[in-house]
């Protein structure tokens, strides 16, 4: 133990709180987790990340496995719990000043400016004090993963009068007993700055190898994850009871299901061909996809990214409570869309984002009214409905959602905030074209074409669902959602901002983001300023382990932010790695004349971005 700190006496009760609550089923030294963190930071290989994680998981006792899985991803719970680790910088600085004897805030601030990371800065200061042999006035407690987790959990849940002081003391209690290396990662966790490049699929690969000796069992873990969205709980069940217990995990109310996704095609004819000549066509709305969980006592709303967004839409919650009184438990999927009350016209996605505010919810409700358009049902009264065919699920929601509005006022939010997504059965391209015209005139993006006998496969992207947008002359028939992975500094008017962003498509087969274009057009001055600020918190020192590109960038980022672009065509490129060698040896696929549409896809995870398979399909369509 390094005695670099002089703890304050009043911190001891909080230390005791953590120790009393430890699980007696075995502990894991936090230093071992730190060793693994450091190895992961140094690697740029996804395979090496997996190897490091396998070694860690094998040495982790079952009682701590869920905590380790959460912590390596920089969280305490699954995303749907909505519990964040981030703590204000000023509070962390106060905790440091109470924990480190003789701390010079000026020196710390200077180191912080140099490193850009408070954890790195504090580690330098603490290391420098080692040689002074400062001795603790009180016996210190052991730093275990369980203790760190429980303390962070208490910090995240502490609210009300005096909460700031309590949080500072809890942070100090950890820093008092940390080595310089441990303190570095404690602070990274507290401030939400842990960037190890560990994706969900990497964790599942490692769990399968560590506990079943076969990566092929990842598919079982993935199925469980798709219906529960909780990797920590899956890991705990796997470690304690084995793979057979994981197979028994089912859909549960208030645990969001990973959404089923659609493939894309360029023409109505191809869509029908995929559907063997008959299909359902639904309006594709320009809103936010949400999942509604209604139980006896409460209603929760989850975003496409599985984040809890209930507080953003209290009007939708109220409408659901009124409309579905007779149904005790239900999980629905739908699209929330902003509406102009004067014209009853649908408004674009950007207008809906005004509802994503923490304060002034009532004002936002009045200024940006919304309606919910339901298109699927996944669960009713403790029974999953995902194995039913599409047409049977549609019949169910038609019985559940009673539409009381007239045809002339389909979006009259004063009378009815819930409606069914308009749908029709189509048997030829002409019927699709006619319904497409109706959708576009109603303010929609296009159509969703769905196979009548398809089941709902959580987390899957397949041709059972196809998205079809209106065709544009001299441009691709659809926009693309791509992930920002790097940037070049701007020149001239763009000095002090980024001049171009490197964008990547997602390769689901290998869980890698592969570059497909640099985009520098379509941005307003405000866009450039906003991106510079937003991307700063995702900036990393080297190319991310899950990014594949031949391009050299001035700056690299974690693959986190998804933006929408349009382009003239997909072309072969020796410089970009998306779909490398799929069409021609040593050539990937790139976008020609890409342009930012102005839309940041906050509703999408990086893994929801355009897949390289879609790029290949779009390229082949051009050649026909």
Whereabouts are the PLM-identified features?
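Detector for conserved single-position "signature" residues within domains
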Residues: 437-444
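A short-motif feature that recognizes glycine-rich, charge-decorated loops
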Residues: 310-311, 512-548, 557
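N-terminal nucleic-acid-engaging modules of covalent nucleotidyltransferase systems
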Residues: 2-428, 501-504, 508-518, 547-551, ...
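Short glycine/proline-enriched turns and hinge-like loops at secondary-structure junctions
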Residues: 293-295, 458-462, 478, 494-499, ...
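Beta-rich nucleic-acid/ligand-interaction surfaces
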Residues: 427-434, 454-458, 465, 540-558
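C-terminal structured "cap/appendage" subdomains that terminate the fold
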Residues: 535-592
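Short beta-turn/strand-loop junction motif enriched in small, turn-promoting residues
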Residues: 192, 359, 454, 471, ...
């Amino acid at each position: 133990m390094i005695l670099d700190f002089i703890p304050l006496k009043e911190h001891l009760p909080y230390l005791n709180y953590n120790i009393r609550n430890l699980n007696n089923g075995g502990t894991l030294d936090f230093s071992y987790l730190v060793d693994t963190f450091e190895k992961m930071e140094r690697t740029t290989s996804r395979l090496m990340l997996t190897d490091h994680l396998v070694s860690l998981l094998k040495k982790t006792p079952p009682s701590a496995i869920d905590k380790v899985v959460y912590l390596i991803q920089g969280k305490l719970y699954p995303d749907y719990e909505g519990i964040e680790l981030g703590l204000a910088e000023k509070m962390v600085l106060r905790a440091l000043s109470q924990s480190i004897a003789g701390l010079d805030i000026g020196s710390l601030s200077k180191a912080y400016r140099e490193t850009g990371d408070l954890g790195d800065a504090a580690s330098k200061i603490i290391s420098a004090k080692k040689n002074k042999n400062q001795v603790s006035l009180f016996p210190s407690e052991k730093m275990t993963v369980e203790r760190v987790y429980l303390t962070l959990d208490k910090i995240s849940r502490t609210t009300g009068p005096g909460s700031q002081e309590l949080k500072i003391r809890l942070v100090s209690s950890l820093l008092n007993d940390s080595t310089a290396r441990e303190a570095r990662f404690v602070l990274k966790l507290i401030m939400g700055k842990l960037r190890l490049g560990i994706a969900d699929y990497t964790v599942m690969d490692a769990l399968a190898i560590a506990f079943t000796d076969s990566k092929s069992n990842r598919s079982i873990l993935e199925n469980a994850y798709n219906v529960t969205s909780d990797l920590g709980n899956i890991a705990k069940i796997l470690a304690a009871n084995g793979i057979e217990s994981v197979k028994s995990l089912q859909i549960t109310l208030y645990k969001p299901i990973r959404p089923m996704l659609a493939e894309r095609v360029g023409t109505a004819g191809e869509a029908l061909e995929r559907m063997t000549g008959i299909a359902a066509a639904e309006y594709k709305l320009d809103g936010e996809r949400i999942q509604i969980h209604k139980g006896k006592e409460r209603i929760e709303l989850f975003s496409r990214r599985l984040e809890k967004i209930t507080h953003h839409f209290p009007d939708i919650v109220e409408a659901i409570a009124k409309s579905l009184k007779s149904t005790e438990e239900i999980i629905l999927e739908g699209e929330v869309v902003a509406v102009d009350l004067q014209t009853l016209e649908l408004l674009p996605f950007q207008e809906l984002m005004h509802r994503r505010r923490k304060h002034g919810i009532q004002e936002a409700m009045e200024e940006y009214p919304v309606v919910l358009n339901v298109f699927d049902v996944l669960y009713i009264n403790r029974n999953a409905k995902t194995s039913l065919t599409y047409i049977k699920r549609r019949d169910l929601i038609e019985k559940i959602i009673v539409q009381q509005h007239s045809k002339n006022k389909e979006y009259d939010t004063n009378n009815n905030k819930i409606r069914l997504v308009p749908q029709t059965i189509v048997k030829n391209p002409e019927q699709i074209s006619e319904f497409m015209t109706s959708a576009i005139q109603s303010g929609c993006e296009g159509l969703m074409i769905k196979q009548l006998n398809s089941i709902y496969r959580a987390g899957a992207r397949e041709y059972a669902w196809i998205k079809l947008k209106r065709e544009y002359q001299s441009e691709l028939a659809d926009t693309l959602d791509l992930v920002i992975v790097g940037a070049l500094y701007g020149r001239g008017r763009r000095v002090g901002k980024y001049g171009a962003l490197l964008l990547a498509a997602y390769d689901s087969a290998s869980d890698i983001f592969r570059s497909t274009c640099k985009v520098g057009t379509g941005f307003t001055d405000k866009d450039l300023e906003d991106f510079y600020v937003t991307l700063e918190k995702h900036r990393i020192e080297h190319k991310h382990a899950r990014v594949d590109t031949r391009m050299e960038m001035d700056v690299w980022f974690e693959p986190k932010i998804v933006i929408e672009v349009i382009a003239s065509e997909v072309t072969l490129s020796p410089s970009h790695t998306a779909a490398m060698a799929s069409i021609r040896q040593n050539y990937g696929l790139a976008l020609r004349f890409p342009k930012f549409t102005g839309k940041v896809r906050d509703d999408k995870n990086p893994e929801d971005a355009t897949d390289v398979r879609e790029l290949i399909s779009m390229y082949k369509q051009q050649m026909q």
